[in-house]
């Protein structure tokens, strides 16, 4: 605790002090509401709605509303659970649009009923976001008892539901579901052709459970709805065979690099160098030469070979940066990503930009084709669309700056209902990993012999299996919980607190489920937590510790560390390493040096800061795309709900004529110098005006403006003729034309937006090259993105008119293959070069903000 905090108290303490009077008001209403009948208590809901309609605010009725929920939950025929004062505090913080940090076992699920009920009274819908379908179903059934008792409707969105079921669930006052389901429904709603096919209402208020997992850990994982691609997969296997033959070099340290530079020696050695800290792998000059020979190309850096570079880079990353049983597993013949934060398998999720295919080639399983992105959004941008959002978690304080800067949410630590009894012991540090694991086994055996349950956390599947082998050699019965044994997760976690249980788990497997102590375990010291390695994030370490000591239970935690662990090896200071070497200690001697604890924490802070910078950097780029998405989806919604789109079509005709005239006739040209043949060809490709001729006698008086006016009038006349043709003189003909306009415009917007997403992604992957030209890549990206967006908008107008002028009504419509939804883990280190679209033009840079672009 800092000097000022000791004097003035920390931020959370001050905020809690402010809300204690509100808690007192809620508690004071308790006796009054206890005397109400079930019917009278239920009637309070309509009373609150009426008061809101007359001008009162949610803050005005909060004490009474929370007291009603508290009383309802406590009744034997509902939950028979009464909110503690600290839970009321958490509920107040969450209503204010903040994050309530509440320790494991403090009843966050019950806390959510308070702000959910209060905000549902406005009738605009409340979304309670959980991390998996099981919790969504459980909580909607369990906590739904309170809401249903009080006359509110409760829905639940689950994977596999059809549109009618989803629409009904979203129409409820309170809707439970996973972050993925909410996000995918938003994307799908922005792809429908008829408004009655939409399922979501406006995004009003979100309560996010495990908010750190959703908004921090998943921040770099975009949701993607994709269609099948058409590229061959052969080159993935060829590139894989090539990189497997390469010889690994090493990165020279600063002294070696300087000496090599002074002696004009080549600084690189080997065919490629791997930088584990930066998570990058690149070819050396020798490696480039081998690639040029292997693939029979003269210059690998030539723009013609950008795609080949992409395949080679992915093959390098797959073979030397991605590791089996750490980053992914092979399950039923498929590559399945392992969540680095939970150790769980993530079926259905794939690395993007071809990295997943490169791993498939590496492991010699079937290589699936790359997919085409139809719609995409990140959780950062999706949840920022809610008018108000809040969160709850056991671990958020270490990421407070990110929550505040990116999401506008501050973190308030809520006191525990009972004092924490868990003892968090000092770290024990060993020189080698082997020495560390021997010490861990000794500690496990000592606890096991007296019957104390032990939960051991490892950072990878490989490490969990190494420890399992050591325990088997010692004859210690134990359970292993990692991505390979995920099916037994609930059962294993449920038994982890029983006497004599030994459980090895990767990271936070089992998060969301409390570990309850078996009979007699409290007397033995409670659950013992052993961390076998510090995670890159202090928050993940805190989550592991938080498995013990729930609701005042006893428990203890300790981390064992070796100087060979990735965190210390990559981010520990050289000064620390030299100090340990000077001590001359053996493998099995623990290092008791206060400086090491500080070094470990500094290493973690360094990584956390680096990861925050990456997420912030990605958001800056994604914000450009987000502004464009807002414009496109806004335009799409206008078309979807538009009764009459004819005015838009008339506007398009004028805009296309004006652009085509300006493109072919410059202001300093005389009418006699105009190339009417080329002009006619360009315009007729869009509006079928035929060959445009200007009579000789009219030439002296002709101007660009007159030509635009004449051709716009002609375009409108031709469109009226098309309307009559489609209408066929029938009363419903105009209605048919308006419906046709709507469908055509939506299809064109969707197609051009898909192409634009692809182009923007390609451009973003290659934009880093601008840094070599001493230009800011982000600024260049914004300029280019604006021009690409304007060009896409023009193409939307042109293609819409092309189709409408030439359309023929047919009775049978071919059904398209439905798109797939997909998660993807972005490979942010890959350098993918922008491809050239056939209709791409040289773009003039204009420093105009995207938000000024209001029309498509």
State where each predicted segment sits:
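Conserved P-loop NTPase motor core
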Residues: 1-587, 633-634, 650-651, 655, ...
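Extended, charged helical/alpha-beta scaffold domains that provide interaction surfaces
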Residues: 328-336, 342-349, 551-552, 559, ...
């Amino acid at each position: 605790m800092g000097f000022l905090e000791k004097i003035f108290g920390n931020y959370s303490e001050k905020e809690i002090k402010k809300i204690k009077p509100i808690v007192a008001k809620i508690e004071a209403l308790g006796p009054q509401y206890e005397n109400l009948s079930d019917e009278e208590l239920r009637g309070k809901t309509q009373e609150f709605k009426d008061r809101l309609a007359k001008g009162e605010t949610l803050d005005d009725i909060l004490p009474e509303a929370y007291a009603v929920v508290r009383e309802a939950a406590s009744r034997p025929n509902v939950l028979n659970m009464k909110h503690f004062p600290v839970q009321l505090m958490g509920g107040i913080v969450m209503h204010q649009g903040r994050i309530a940090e509440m320790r494991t076992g403090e009843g966050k699920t019950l806390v959510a009923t308070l702000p959910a009920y209060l905000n549902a009274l406005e009738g605009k819908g409340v979304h309670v976001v959980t991390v998996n379908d099981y919790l969504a179903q459980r909580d909607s059934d369990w906590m739904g008892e309170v809401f249903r008792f009080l006359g509110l409707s409760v829905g639940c969105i689950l994977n596999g539901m059809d549109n009618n079921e989803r629409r009904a669930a979203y129409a409820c006052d309170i809707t439970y579901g996973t972050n993925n389901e909410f996000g995918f429904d938003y994307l799908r709603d922005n792809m429908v052709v008829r408004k009655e096919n939409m399922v979501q209402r406006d995004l009003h208020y979100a309560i996010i459970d495990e908010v750190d997992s959703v908004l921090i850990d998943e921040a770099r994982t975009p949701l993607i709805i994709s269609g099948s691609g058409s590229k061959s997969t052969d080159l993935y296997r060829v590139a894989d065979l090539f990189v497997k033959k390469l010889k690994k070099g090493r990165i020279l340290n600063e002294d070696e690099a300087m000496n090599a530079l002074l002696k004009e020696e080549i600084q690189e050695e080997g065919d490629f160098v791997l930088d584990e800290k930066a998570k990058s792998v690149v070819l050396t000059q020798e490696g480039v030469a081998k690639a040029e020979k292997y693939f029979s190309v003269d210059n690998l850096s030539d723009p013609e070979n950008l795609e080949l570079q992409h395949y080679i880079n992915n093959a390098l990353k797959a073979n030397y940066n991605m590791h089996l049983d750490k980053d992914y597993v092979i399950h039923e013949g498929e590559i399945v990503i392992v969540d680095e934060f939970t150790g769980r398998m993530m079926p259905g999720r794939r690395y993007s930009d071809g990295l997943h295919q490169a791993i498939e080639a590496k492991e010699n399983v079937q290589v699936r084709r790359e997919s085409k992105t139809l719609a995409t959004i990140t959780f950062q941008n999706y949840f920022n669309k809610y008018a108000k959002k809040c969160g709850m978690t056991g671990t958020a304080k270490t990421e407070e700056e990110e929550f505040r800067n990116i999401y506008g949410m501050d973190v308030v630590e809520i006191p525990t209902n009972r004092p924490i009894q868990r003892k968090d012991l000092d770290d024990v540090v060993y020189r080698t990993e082997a020495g560390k694991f021997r010490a861990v086994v000794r500690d496990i055996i000592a606890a096991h012999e007296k019957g104390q349950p032990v939960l051991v956390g490892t950072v990878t599947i490989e490490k969990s299996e190494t420890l399992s082998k050591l325990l088997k050699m010692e004859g210690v019965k134990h359970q292993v919980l990692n991505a390979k044994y995920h099916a037994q997760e609930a059962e294993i976690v449920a038994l982890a607190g029983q006497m004599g249980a030994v459980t090895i788990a990767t990271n936070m497997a089992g998060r969301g489920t409390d570990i309850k102590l078996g009979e007699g375990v409290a007397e033995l010291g409670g659950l013992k937590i052993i961390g076998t390695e510090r995670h890159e994030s202090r928050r993940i370490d805190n989550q592991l510790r938080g498995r013990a000591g729930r609701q005042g239970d006893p428990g203890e935690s300790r981390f064992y560390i070796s100087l060979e662990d990735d965190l210390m090896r990559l981010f520990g200071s050289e000064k620390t390493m030299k100090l340990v070497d000077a001590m001359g200690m053996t493998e099995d001697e623990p290092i008791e040096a206060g400086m090491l604890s500080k070094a470990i924490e500094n290493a973690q802070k360094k990584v956390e800061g680096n990861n925050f910078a990456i997420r912030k950097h990605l958001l800056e780029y994604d914000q450009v795309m987000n502004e464009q998405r807002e414009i496109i989806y806004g335009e799409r919604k206008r078309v979807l709900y538009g009764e009459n789109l004819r005015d838009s079509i008339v506007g398009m005709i004028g805009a296309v004529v004006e652009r085509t005239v300006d493109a072919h006739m410059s202001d300093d040209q005389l009418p006699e110098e105009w190339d009417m043949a080329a002009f006619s060809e360009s315009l007729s490709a869009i509006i079928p005006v035929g060959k445009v001729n200007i009579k000789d006698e009219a030439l002296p008086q002709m101007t660009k403006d007159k030509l635009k006016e004449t051709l716009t009038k002609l375009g409108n006349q031709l469109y009226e003729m098309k309307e009559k043709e489609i209408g066929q003189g029938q009363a419903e003909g105009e209605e048919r034309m308006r419906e046709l306009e709507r469908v055509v415009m939506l299809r064109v917007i969707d197609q051009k937006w898909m192409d634009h997403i692809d182009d923007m992604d390609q451009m973003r992957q290659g934009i880093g090259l601008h840094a070599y030209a001493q230009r800011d890549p982000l600024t260049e990206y914004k300029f280019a993105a604006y021009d690409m967006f304007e060009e896409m908008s023009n193409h939307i107008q042109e293609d819409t008119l092309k189709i409408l002028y030439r359309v023929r009504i047919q009775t049978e419509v071919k059904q398209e293959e439905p798109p797939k939804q997909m998660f993807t883990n972005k490979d942010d280190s890959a350098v993918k070069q922008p491809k050239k679209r056939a209709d791409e033009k040289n773009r003039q840079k204009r420093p105009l903000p995207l938000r000024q672009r209001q029309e498509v």
